[in-house]
Every structure is written in structure tokens, then in C-alpha cells.
Amino acid sequence: WLTSQPQPWRATVALDSAAYHVEKIMQNRHSRFYDQAFGDQPSNWKALSPISQLHQALPAFLAVCSTTRPDQPCTQAQQFIQHAQKLGTKAQLLPLPLSHFEINKSLGKDNSYTQAVNQFIQTHSFTIE
């Protein structure tokens, strides 16, 4: 049913994830949300943890994060970005003084945040022929 091969995955824009290091989250005090998402089996946490699974370069990666959240997602995002860069990934951090809700709601509006995300996408886009 495919008339041509899919184009390669070019880039990721991660919006305010606070779960780059699942093992660390689960070993410390955390929201019940994480128990629902990742379960109560420590043996599974490493397999579910993006930073633990990062062993080779990824396509370009932009981590958008909130600087106002008490769980400090920018700290985890920065650690992930640094690890990805060491492996050769073109990775960037975009910290914003917005809540998680505001990060999701304001993307696409006429603001500097949307412009930064668009610039990242354009930098890593390609022409489909």
C-alpha cells in the first residue's frame, strides 16, 4: 500500500518531558503519576529510561523544558542533551519560563518560542520529491 519508502526520521522536538532518567525519578520521592506510567518494578525502569537507552547518536533533538516546574525538568533534559551530544547528536535545550500547560498551549502562536521551534525544524528539514 506504500507507494514509496518512508523518509528517514530527521528530528525530535520533546515538549517538557520530566522523564529522561526514569530510574532516578522512581528511586526518589515522586508523583503517583510516575507509578502509573512506569510501574513498581525496578528491573523495568532502566529499560523505560531514555538516558539509559541512549547508546548511539540520534537524529537532531530539541528538548523544550519549563524553568518554573518544581520537579526541574530542565536538569534532566540538560543531562540527556549532554549525553546525546557526546554520542554525536545535534541536540539543543530550550528552557522556557512557562508552565507545562503553557508550553503545550503556546506552541504555534506568534511568539519567540514558536519561532525557535520552527527554526530548529527548518534547520533539520528536507525537501520531499
Please identify what each model-predicted range represents:
Residues 50-58, 75:
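Conserved serine/cysteine hydrolase catalytic core
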Residues 68-72:
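Acidic catalytic loop of the alpha/beta-hydrolase fold
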Residues 57, 62-66:
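Short beta-strand/loop motif that positions the catalytic acidic residue
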Residues 6-7, 55:
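Alpha-helix termination/capping residues and helix-transition junctions
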